[in-house]
From Swiss-Prot:
Its cofactor is Ca(2+); chloride. The record marks D310 as: Transition state stabilizer. Chloride binds at R206, N308, R343. This is Alpha-amylase-related protein. The active site is at D208, E245. It comes from Drosophila bipectinata (Fruit fly). It comes from the Eukaryota. Belongs to the glycosyl hydrolase 13 family. It catalyses: Endohydrolysis of (1->4)-alpha-D-glucosidic linkages in polysaccharides containing three or more (1->4)-alpha-linked D-glucose units. Ca(2+) binds at N118, Q169, D178, H212. Residues 1-20 form the signal peptide. The gene is Amyrel. GO terms for molecular function: alpha-amylase activity; metal ion binding. Binds 1 Ca(2+) ion per subunit.
Length: 494
């Protein structure tokens, strides 16, 4: 009986811990993460204080923090080829990272680190040097900076069959040296690395290439981590938020369902589906059942995004900053519709898949610069600073915990819906105007459209909509309007 009771208790503890790993630990009503891709730590700290905190962003996903291989031309993907777990990269050193985490936490913006637990670097001819000066011999699987030796890796093999579980989880993803996460030594070094980041105040982790690691191994690693650091404003016994990169298009041998109980999972079907819809390949009317109705994961288990740093570089349905009108419309819908744990992208300009982040002649990453309206101008795209996007972050905060109601569509690609009695969104993706009296569900009054402008000193700088005593307002979105969206919420009432 004692053994049975003990087993039950252990199962309950594990289940509780797993559930806790779905909690992103946001402040107040904040509920949107931004990925500041390849930004320096000092610049992220300033952005938290000057923009993200005041605009109500909940958190930042940062690029990998540990030492990586130095590759010719400094492509972005060198950050995904570890040499050691020393906290020195082109984004800064450990002191600068710790300062950034502290400053962001102080203004209510949580930090989530992109971590590489699956592998080390790819092959390199001879001695490779990392961003902290560590040397390694990747061809011999020798990484003294950790240290790892060949005994800590799976035997080398290529992934040629993506339906072969052994290949997917024990062979080398694009030639990257594949760690053996069942090894006690490897586990200890990974846990030590993650625990150090927790000590510095991070709120959680985006786990790169999670599907290439056995779920049981990841479960052991996650459950062995320390609680979050209460000195950074986290409650006692808070567990790190985990969201895992698992690419699953619905026909994968290694599926998302193996990982969604361990933490949230990146819902790539969301990205593809929303891209298809706003590119005009699917009528927007079908988005009424968006989310689980489309076969997506349960809302609290899905990390959702229009694009990410990988798929924005691929040809296909996925939208990126190069299609700005459709991208802003898709992002507005993403942040208005009550599904998923939302992340928005903040990119740098690229002409090909390997383009490096903006850098100077010494190959040092440069800081973003801003024009008089706050937009980035020197190679950084900064979608999160586009008014149409940061305004929808505010919309999402204003309508948090409300339900979708009063869906309307024209049978094609003009849609609208309410979020409780706090918000209203209308979208026009047709080649003709939307001009319609629509139920906004809002209290009577005049509301500023936060897409075309904002509420400043008691008046609207863009469009406005007058809502009558029955909740109806006249919405007009021209087919040739700069933006195909209209958004109203209670915090933008005149």
């Amino acid at each position: 009986m004692f053994k049975f009771a003990t087993a039950v208790i252990l199962c309950l503890v594990a289940a509780s811990s797993t559930l806790a790993q779905h909690n992103p630990h946001w402040w107040g009503n904040r509920n949107t993460i931004v990925h500041l891709f390849e930004w320096k730590w000092s610049d992220i700290a300033a952005e938290c204080e000057n923009f993200l905190g005041p605009r109500g962003f909940a958190g930042v996903q940062v690029s990998p923090v540990n030492e990586n291989i130095v590759s010719a031309g400094r492509p972005w993907w060198e950050r995904y080829q570890p040499i050691s777990y020393k906290l020195t990269t082109r984004s800064g050193n450990e002191k600068e990272f710790a300062d950034m985490v502290r400053r962001c936490n102080e203004v209510g913006v949580r930090i989530y680190v992109d971590v590489l637990l699956n592998h080390m670097s790819g092959d390199f001819d001879g001695i490779a040097v990392g961003t902290a000066g560590s040397e390694a011999e990747p061809s011999k699987k020798s990484y003294p900076g950790v240290p790892y030796s060949a005994l800590d890796f799976h035997p080398s093999c290529e992934i040629t069959d993506w339906n072969d579980r052994f290949q997917v989880q024990q062979c080398e993803l694009v030639g990257l040296k594949d760690l053996d996460q069942s090894s006690e030594w490897v586990r200890s070094k990974l846990i030590e690395f993650l625990d150090h980041l927790i000590e510095l105040g991070v709120a959680g982790f985006r786990v790169d290439a999670a599907k290439h690691m056995a779920a049981d191994d990841l479960s052991f690693i996650y459950s062995s981590l320390s609680d979050l650091n209460i000195e950074h404003g986290f409650p006692h016994n808070a567990r790190p938020f985990i969201f895992q990169e698992v690419i699953d298009h619905g026909h994968e041998t290694v599926s998302r369902e193996e990982y969604n109980q361990l933490g949230a999972v990146t819902e790539f079907r969301f990205s593809e589906g929303i891209g298809n819809a706003f590119r005009g390949n699917n009528a927007l009317k079908w988005l009424q059942s968006w989310g689980t109705g489309w076969g997506f994961l349960p809302s609290g288990q899905a990390l959702t995004f229009v694009d990410n740093h990988d798929n924005q570089r691929d040809m296909g349905a996925v939208l990126n900053y190069k299609s700005p009108k459709q991208y802003k419309m898709a992002t507005a819908f993403h942040l208005a519709y009550p599904y998923g744990i939302s992340r928005v992208m903040s990119s740098f300009a690229f002409d090909d898949h390997d383009t490096a982040p903006p850098q100077d002649e010494q190959e040092k990453i440069i800081s973003p610069e801003f024009d008089e309206e706050g937009a980035c101008v020197n190679g950084w795209i900064c979608e999160h600073r586009w008014r149409q996007i940061y305004a929808m972050v505010g919309f999402k905060n204003a309508v948090r915990d409300t339900e979708l109601s009063n869906w309307w569509d024209n049978g094609d690609s003009q849609i609208s819906f309410c979020r409780g009695n706090k918000g209203f969104l209308a979208v026009n993706n047709n080649l003709y105007d939307l001009s319609q009296e629509l139920q906004t569900c809002l209290p009577a009054g005049v509301y500023c459209d936060v897409i075309s402008g904002s509420l400043v000193d008691g008046s609207c700088t863009g469009k406005s909509v007058t809502v009558d005593d029955n909740g109806y307002g006249y919405a007009h979105i021209g087919s040739d309007d700069f933006d195909g969206v209209l958004a109203l919420h209670v915090d933008a009432k005149v």
